[in-house]
Amino acid sequence: MISNKIAILLAVLVVAVACAQARVALKHRSVQALPRFLPRPKYDVGHRIVGGFEIDVSETPYQVSLQYFNSHRCGGSVLNSKWILTAAHCTVNLQPSSLAVRLGSSRHASGGTVVRVARVLEHPNYDDSTIDYDFSLMELESELTFSDVVQPVSLPDQDEAVEDGTMTIVSGWGNTQSAAESNAILRAANVPTVNQKECTIAYSSSGGITDRMLCAGYKRGGKDACQGDSGGPLVVDGKLVGVVSWGFGCAMPGYPGVYARVAVVRDWVRENSGA
């Protein structure tokens, strides 16, 4: 009798564990369609831009590497001497003490200056399931000294529009999807902005995009941000218009990159960082 009860309890336990594992697997599959923003430490973050070219950090002196326990995790942009803007999915659920930024270097793993993060402010409306309001402000422990390779980026006005087809530059250390291209040096790609309705249609199967997002890329694909570029800058004429956020694959035909639209949170950025 006792042995039968034990057998039944073991069977129930096995079923419960199997169900829990299935739920975890389903959750992981549900985000694999958007691999650019898969968070660490559960998933690896890559190191290169797709279809781009090497640049010196002096060409994008606002670019930073967000480091998680001394390893490159995401990109970011200098707002002023104390604040950095990145993507909320890069910092959510992480302690500020685990984060630092490397500035003034074309290499994410060496050179320049490393400054620790003192405080993180994700946008209060950030939605981890839809990646809406994908913005995070990071306050640094010490003030930056500006130079030819460390400079704040200009910001748009609140709700300032970006015309369709505007050529942008996106930079970072994300995945190039090419074994022939080194992951050590900062890279960039020029991509045009995409009509909002066209981008919504492209991503209709995953719920489309919101007004807090903008898209950039070529219909034929070939150039895009990728894993490891998340949080980095999308810039037009020296002005930060987007933050690398998500997308279906990287540089895939018909699927432009999706960026968090900076102009919609301009007032929030100013109120919290003074930038």
Swiss-Prot record:
InterPro entries in the record: Peptidase_S1 (IPR050430), Peptidase_S1_PA (IPR009003), Peptidase_S1_PA_chymotrypsin (IPR043504), Peptidase_S1A (IPR001314), Trypsin_dom (IPR001254), TRYPSIN_HIS (IPR018114), TRYPSIN_SER (IPR033116)
Active site: 89, 134, 230
Tissue: Expressed in the midgut. Expression levels drop a few hours after blood feeding and pick up again 28 hours later.
Propeptide stretch(es), residue numbers: 23-48
Residues covered by the Peptidase S1 domain: 49-274
SMART domains: Tryp_SPc
SS bond list: 74-90, 199-215, 226-250
Marked site: Required for specificity: 224
Localization per Swiss-Prot or TrEMBL: Secreted
Cellular-component GO terms for this entry: extracellular region
Keywords recorded for this protein, A-Z: Digestion, Disulfide bond, Hydrolase, Protease, Secreted, Serine protease, Signal, Zymogen
Signal peptide: 1-22
GO terms for biological process, alphabetical: digestion; proteolysis
Catalytic activity entry: Preferential cleavage: Arg-|-Xaa, Lys-|-Xaa
Family of this protein: Belongs to the peptidase S1 family.
PANTHER family the record matches: GH13245P2-RELATED, POLYSERASE-RELATED
Function comment: Constitutive trypsin that is expressed 2 days after emergence, coinciding with host seeking behavior of the female.
Name of the molecule in the record: Trypsin-3
Native organism: Anopheles gambiae (African malaria mosquito)
